[in-house]
Amino acid sequence: NLQETAFTECALNGANLRGARLTQTVFNQCEMANLRVEETPLDGCIFNHCTLTGSHFTGCSLQTVQFMHCALEDSHFDRAIPERSVFFESPLTHARFAGCRFLLTTFYGIDLRTTVLEGSQFERVVFFNCDQRGKNYARHGFTGCQFTENQLDGADFSGAQLTQCNFKGASLQTAQLNQVNATQALFMEANLRGAQCRGSVFDQAIFVGATLEQADFSQSRLFQSILQQVNAAGACFTLCDLTYSDFTGADLRLADLRGATFSRTRMHRANQENARFTGRQGILEYDEEVGAAEAWSRQRQ
């Protein structure tokens, strides 16, 4: 029974704590490489500045567990269930999290490029300032997750569920977002230059201030999406459903909108130089209410 026990600067390399009662147990600056704690519930435990390389947390229930500045390279968390847990600036190089169920868990400032996350489910998980370039998240489920300020260039989200996810300020250059469901997702100020977003659902998604240069949204649905002030020069929106979409102030130079469906689609003050259209029926070239608000704003300055 290690409930509420505190270990400080202890040598615990290779320790076997399987089946131990680990509730509100604290480990400070301990050497714990190759720890074995498989299939054991951890509740409210804190690992602070510990060496945990090669440790085995396979099948563990991790309730409100904090890993703060820990070395977790080559560790095993397969089939674990982290809930309300935190991985803070703890290297996870070649660590394994296959088949995990993450709920309300935070990854802060971690390079996840070599971390195995295949077959895992993510609900309301926060990835803050993490390097995830080139990650393969094809057909993974992300619900209400935060990818704020993440590096996701070249990541593959093909067929993924991204409902209500937040990619504000993230870099998604050349990322694969084909056949995704990104309903009500947030892409404010994100960089999707050259991203592939074909055949996807972006209903009520918000792209305000995003970079969409050369991105391909062909055959996608952007019902009620907000694309104000986006840089979509050279982007492809062929055969898209742009019903009630708002391109106010957008840069659409050289964009391809042939075959797109328009219905009360706002193009107020959008730069459409050399953009290609099959027809313009359903486009609102000038929004009187927005124009009046702009005039009022200028008078107030």
Language model segments and positions:
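Tandem repeat scaffolds
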Residues: N1-Q301
